[in-house]
């Protein structure tokens, strides 16, 4: 593969893997919680965490020569603020109702990452 194609492959792969990390994290919380032991759930969370960090390294290796849709950036940023912000507030303020807000942020993060993967273009 040429330099351009390799950078594109690394970046797109990283974005898809990061998207899957978010999906796996949500599955761990909502799907596995009552089906596995606490120890196994912690192991699952460790796997998700490492997957996310490694996907970021792939993205970092590839992004230096690409432009991405600004919409993707704003989706990811707003999703992160809504998702993490609602969970932090849920924990700190003990407001259970905020748990229903988190999936909106998760959906925005997933949409932003997929839009990033689709909209990548080489810099001029």
Where would I find each of the regions flagged by the language model?
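Polytopic transmembrane helical bundles with strong interfacial aromatic enrichment
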Residues: 2-124
């Amino acid at each position: 593969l040429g330099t351009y194609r390799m950078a594109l492959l690394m970046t797109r792969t990283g974005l898809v893997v990061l998207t899957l990390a978010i999906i796996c994290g949500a599955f761990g919380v909502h799907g596995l919680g009552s089906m596995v032991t606490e120890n196994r759930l912690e192991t699952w969370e460790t796997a998700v965490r490492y997957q996310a960090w490694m996907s970021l390294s792939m993205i970092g290796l590839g992004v230096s020569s690409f432009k991405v849709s600004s919409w993707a950036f704003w989706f990811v940023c707003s999703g992160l603020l809504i998702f993490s912000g609602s969970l932090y507030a849920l924990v700190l303020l003990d407001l259970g109702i905020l748990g229903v807000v988190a999936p909106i942020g998760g959906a925005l993060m997933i949409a932003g990452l997929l839009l990033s993967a689709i909209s990548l273009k080489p810099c001029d």
